[in-house]
Amino acid sequence: MSQDLVWSIIKKNNAFLKSSHGLTLSAEPGNLRNKNSLKYSGLARRTTIDVAAVNGKVVVSSKIVKKAAFPAQSKKTTTFSTVNTRKTARFVKTLATQYAPELRAAALGRLHRVQSALRSAKKAAARKAKKN
């Protein structure tokens, strides 16, 4: 199926849509900006990049275009620790540039937000551990 046909089917009706105050946002995996549009859709596009936090680590995943007919096999994931943030940023920048150049800025922005959220979660946990 073409991505335009899939988008025309799911754009107004899917389980990930969130509407509030006239805005329609999307919470689907692979949607880097959470906008309900074809450019950022993780369901309709053939090429998607997803950056998420799982168990205190950064997980970067992308779709394998050749395996699109097999959804269970169509994701490639790479896990990074929070220690080396520049290495992770370089990986995401290279992946996005080669794979989906129009998503490079969005992928790096999502990576920055995920890494800062993980850092603040660690600091909050460390403060709670102190007792007098």
From Swiss-Prot:
<dbReference type="InterPro" id="IPR029004">
    <property type="entry name" value="Ribosomal_eL28/Mak16"/>
</dbReference>
<protein>
    <recommendedName>
        <fullName>Large ribosomal subunit protein eL28</fullName>
    </recommendedName>
</protein>
<dbReference type="GO" id="GO:0003735">
    <property type="term" value="F:structural constituent of ribosome"/>
</dbReference>
<dbReference type="GO" id="GO:0031012">
    <property type="term" value="C:extracellular matrix"/>
</dbReference>
<keyword id="KW-0689">Ribosomal protein</keyword>
<comment type="similarity">
    <text>Belongs to the eukaryotic ribosomal protein eL28 family.</text>
</comment>
<dbReference type="GO" id="GO:0006412">
    <property type="term" value="P:translation"/>
</dbReference>
<dbReference type="GO" id="GO:0022625">
    <property type="term" value="C:cytosolic large ribosomal subunit"/>
</dbReference>
<dbReference type="InterPro" id="IPR002672">
    <property type="entry name" value="Ribosomal_eL28"/>
</dbReference>
<keyword id="KW-0687">Ribonucleoprotein</keyword>
<dbReference type="Pfam" id="PF01778">
    <property type="entry name" value="Ribosomal_L28e"/>
</dbReference>
